Amino acid sequence: MADNQIPITQIEDGTVKQPSVWRNLLIDGLWKNNGALVQLLGLCPLLAVSNSVTNALGLGLATLFVLLCTNVTISLFRQMIPHDIRIPIYVMVIATVVTAVQLLMNAFAYPVYQSLGIFIPLIVTNCIVIGRAEAYASKHQVHHSAFDGLATGLGMTLSLVLLGAIRELIGNGTLFDGLDLLFGDWAKVLRLDLLQLDSGLLLAILPPGAFIGLGLILAVKNLFDHK
């Protein structure tokens, strides 16, 4: 079935029932068509910054915000954007939103901004963002496009956080360390010391550990999909 097509089902009284568009968008974004775990898009930031939950959540929320704003903007002006130059226009819209996100993180979450570094502006080139703009937002109404951006962003964020949690736990024995850098001093109480390690497995927080962790997550997801 083509991406984003809504299946039509027959019910007992002979009428045709169309499943909820919202439900399908949510399931696609979180599981069936997850940008990171199914389409394998945006792997560069996914692998590079997911060495802790804090970094993963910071980049995930930034990407979610960019997806949401970009989808809404492009859907609003979809009838006015010339078809022949639509891609450069999409990139300009994405770059504008990313610049705003970068300035906000610089002002309110500077340590995380420093930690993520170049990967915040690189959201501009993330294929997930421009892919949803081209495949969905440019063809659908604003409310559906906004929810598509939200669902896709949540799927990306959850993938990042899951990989970050695995790597942080194995590498440092902790979870949610440094979350106060994102949410303030109150978040210090969320830190969990789950494994009492004198020295964690360094491989887990290095790039090879990211590939191994992602491979394990993909294997588990495929196992569930084929049951």
From Swiss-Prot:
One of its GO terms (cellular component) is plasma membrane. The keyword Translocase applies. It is a multi-pass membrane protein. Belongs to the NqrDE/RnfAE family. Part of a membrane-bound complex that couples electron transfer with translocation of ions across the membrane. HAMAP family: RsxE_RnfE. The complex is composed of six subunits: RnfA, RnfB, RnfC, RnfD, RnfE and RnfG. This is Ion-translocating oxidoreductase complex subunit E.
